[in-house]
Amino acid sequence: MKNQTSVSFQTSCGLLQKLVDTAERKSRENLKQFGGRLVLIEGGGYEKIWLETQPMGGEMYAKRNLEAGINNQLLFMENQRADGRIPGSVACEDGKIIPQFNKFQGFCFPSAALNVYYLMGKDPGYLDLLYTTLERFDSYLWRVRDSDGDGCLETWCKYDTGEDHALRYGDAPDDWSKETPPEGCSVVPMASMDIMSFSYASRETLAKISRIRNDMEKMEFWKEKAAQVQGKIRTYLWDETAGACFDRDKNHRVLRTMTHNNLRAMYWNSFTQQMADRFVNDHLLNPEEFWTHMPLPSVAVNDPLFRNVTTNDWSGQAEALTYQRAIRALENYGYDSLIPELGEKLFQAIGEDCIFVQQYDPFTAAPSLVCLEGEQDCYGPALLSVLEYAARMYGVHLEQDTVFWGTVGGYE
């Protein structure tokens, strides 16, 4: 029997109802056919499925369209290369699916893909494919992305971590297809909390899959392997005095830019609780850094490398994608109480106009309406963020076998 999915939401608050209804309608515009397969693209001018957004986006949308949610996982798994590398994006041109390997483009995949296993009814074949995909990708990372042998995985281009135009990358290339690092750059290959977290999240999910299979020996194996990655992050990238992680350049020098990537690491669950507590209390909630009028700029607003650029730029403005990832990041470490604060900020920033864009001014909360080649709307991470924050605050959400009820007051 085919699984049936649907979501219903009603509230007496006119703004919230309008936001949810509009997000529902505009999300449907991002449903596309890729070679006869229904997928949810990123939208807002981004016509592909990217590894940094669309497995996570597909999992969030699976409650409304399970077929698209599943395909947003499978197209990455089915197009994994023989050497274990997963495509950073998948395009469709003239009906043909084209996996692209010129960047990692983030990795919001393992936890989302595992959750889809539960949403689809626990298909063992899907679980086997996910296990194999993650095991092979983790092996690829450690075989290729520790080019100097210091035990810390590296990012080689801006798009590896999805940080378009980020100043902290210096003269690094935007993308990179080769299996050896670029030469002659000032910063890369860069020891990276993001890429290390790719490995941690893969290994943690492999441990969870092993538990589902009742393979306790493998579960302990992967838990120990994940702990090794977490330990290296703590000893090599974490600064106990500063209470934050910092990447290192090709000469192992600490790059002191205070970045939101610490929150990304929390999304991948690669911080210890103590590390997360320090970053949240010392930096995330600091109004001089990340807890601005519109919270979550990509770089702390008092950092020398912050730029309040209104077009796609990860050196500054608050990104809808960061809001989307922040939900899991905060839930992982018990900071659920911050989710309604962020949700309310996002609802008010989008407002009655219901234009869903990529970036927001951290000082005024004004949406940056122009991106790529013109005015932007229907940006998937903004649409799905509205739907997910509403579910967390006033509805229900599903995490593996558990149903959570939102009980925030104010919009009954």
Residue ranges of model-derived segments:
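Short, mixed-charge aromatic SLiMs
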Residues: 78-89, 136-140, 231-235, 285-296, ...
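The feature captures the catalytic groove of carbohydrate-active enzymes
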Residues: 88-108, 139-224, 254-256, 261, ...
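Active-site acid/base region of carbohydrate-active enzymes
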Residues: 4-6, 10-22, 63-64, 81-83, ...
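Glycine-rich, acidic and aromatic/proline-enriched surface loops and short helix-turn segments
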Residues: 21-32, 66, 75-82, 109, ...
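Catalytic cores of carbohydrate-active enzymes
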Residues: 3-33, 46-48, 142-158, 198-278, ...
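Aromatic-rich carbohydrate-recognition surfaces in CAZymes
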Residues: 48-73, 78-166, 196, 316-333, ...
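Active-site flanking loop/helix segments enriched in acidic
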Residues: 38-43
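C-terminal capping/lid segments that line or modulate ligand- or cofactor-binding pockets
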Residues: 11, 49, 99-105, 109-119, ...
